[in-house]
Amino acid sequence: MGENMKKKVVIIGGGAAGMSAASRVKRLKPEWDVKVFEATEWVSHAPCGIPYVVEGLSTPDKLMYYPPEVFIKKRGIDLHLNAEVIEVDTGYVRVRENGGEKSYEWDYLVFANGASPQVPAIEGVNLKGVFTADLPPDALAIREYMEKYKVENVVIIGGGYIGIEMAEAFAAQGKNVTMIVRGERVLRRSFDKEVTDILEEKLKKHVNLRLQEITMKIEGEERVEKVVTDAGEYKAELVILATGIKPNIELAKQLGVRIGETGAIWTNEKMQTSVENVYAAGDVAETRHVITGRRVWVPLAPAGNKMGYVAGSNIAGKELHFPGVLGTAVTKFMDVEIGKTGLTEMEALKEGYDVRTAFIKASTRPHYYPGGREIWLKGVVDNETNRLLGVQVVGSDILPRIDTAAAMLMAGFTTKDAFFTDLAYAPPFAPVWDPLIVLARVLKF
């Protein structure tokens, strides 16, 4: 192959999506020049692990899935760390690195520059002791701050996944945790009320849960001392802002890339953007929902990795389509696990479906076998076609049920298909009527 055939691929962002894209291009086209520019010193890191480092279950260095050397030496990727892309134009990018600025040419460009924490516009967010949980160094900074200032009182602002995981991280260490949630319940965008009610029951045993309160300001002299809401004030030596994230679309806008209705970069099923030879993947990109076909922005790691893989494949000439997402997600607080896949009842009604639902309580083992725990499942079905639209699970041993339900949704199962799915059974693992099968039966067909 002649020198003129070697393409230059530039990838902005060295997280899950960026490194997946880079690795895929190099595997298919080893002779191509693949450059990744990562603004921090962390590549292929696992931000989802931050709460567990704060809890003391792991260490920050373990949050890097592969060290940079693996990508540079083993995979031949030209990886630039602490390299911030400051300008993007047709055919080149300008990068700030090593104290200077440099331009690099591209034939193909991938935006994989993720999302950033949404910091509320309130007084005191810049005080010492106020943190976001965004990158592995945040975990280290939080641990060090806790030890240095002997933190006992923690306030978490936000009731989403990160808020709940951070609440566990501090409560498990015996800290006094207050959680301030603007909405009427936690995880309200992801789950229906019956499901979050069970989680909240557990939360309230370990956390001062303040629902429907708006944070007005954070106060302190040298460092944070208290959080003031429209309903009261709470002592705090440490505050976590878990108030959501937003896609980093500024660089894409410079190039005139179309921003989708969700506020993230619009992509097609090949992860191509509206600009030729420009792709986007991961938390910066929107995709389609498998059930509704609508545009959605679901910034979660498994999809981000796959989007990167798909972008890399298509750049290297091996056509591959990304089918979209179900928004499958799972988290836990202490021993209560909660997960979902597909649409909630709330979402399905909003989409115009005529739905039937069922909410059941079951056990994870037969009654005669020790170790059985409670599990609750909610199913949402299209009333006309009996097609499964979504499943939510809360309690214990939820993962096999959520993952099985996700596969069912991907395959377009009806309640009857779900009911007749031949699941495994033995007393140490599950009851003879698995909770998921019982749910299908109660949903009727």
From Swiss-Prot:
UniProt: CoA binding residues: 27, 44-48, 65-66, 75, 305, 361, 433, 441
Amino-acid positions noted as binding FAD in the UniProt annotation, renumbered to this chain: 16-17, 38-39, 45-47, 85, 283, 301, 425
Gene Ontology molecular function: CoA-disulfide reductase (NADPH) activity; flavin adenine dinucleotide binding; NADP binding; protein disulfide isomerase activity
Family as reported in the entry's similarity comment: Belongs to the class-III pyridine nucleotide-disulfide oxidoreductase family.
Function of the molecule: Catalyzes the NAD(P)H-dependent reduction of polysulfide, CoA-polysulfides, and CoA persulfide, as well as the reduction of a range of other small persulfides, including TNB and glutathione persulfides. The likely in vivo substrates are di-, poly-, and persulfide derivatives of coenzyme A, although polysulfide itself is also efficiently reduced. Shows coenzyme A disulfide reductase (CoADR) activity with both NADH and NADPH, with a preference for NADPH. May also play a role in the reduction of elemental sulfur.
Subunit note: Homodimer. Homotetramer.
Cofactor requirement: FAD
Family matches, as Pfam families: Pyr_redox_2, Pyr_redox_dim
Catalytic residues as annotated in Swiss-Prot or TrEMBL: 48 (redox-active)
Domain comment (free text): When compared to homologous enzymes known to reduce CoA disulfide, this enzyme shows a narrower access channel for CoA substrates, which suggests that this restriction might be responsible for the enzyme's poor activity toward the bulky CoA disulfide substrate. The substrate channel was widened by making four mutations along the channel wall (Y65A, Y66A, P67G, and H367G), leading to a fourfold increase in kcat for the NAD(P)H-dependent reduction of CoA disulfide and enhanced activity toward the substrate at lower temperatures.
Protein name: NAD(P)H coenzyme A polysulfide/persulfide reductase
Temperature dependence: Optimum temperature is 85 degrees Celsius. Thermostable.
Catalytic activity entry: NADP(+) + 2 CoA = CoA-disulfide + NADPH + H(+); NAD(+) + 2 CoA = CoA-disulfide + NADH + H(+)
Keywords linked to the UniProt accession: FAD, Flavoprotein, NAD, NADP, Oxidoreductase, Redox-active center
Protein species of origin: Pyrococcus horikoshii (strain ATCC 700860 / DSM 12428 / JCM 9974 / NBRC 100139 / OT-3)
Co-factor remark: Binds 1 FAD per subunit.
InterPro entries on file: CoA_disulphide_reductase, FAD-bd_OxRdtase, FAD/NAD-bd_sf, FAD/NAD-binding_dom, FAD/NAD-linked_Rdtase_dimer_sf, Pyr_nucl-diS_OxRdtase_dimer
Protein EC: 1.8.1.-, 1.8.1.14
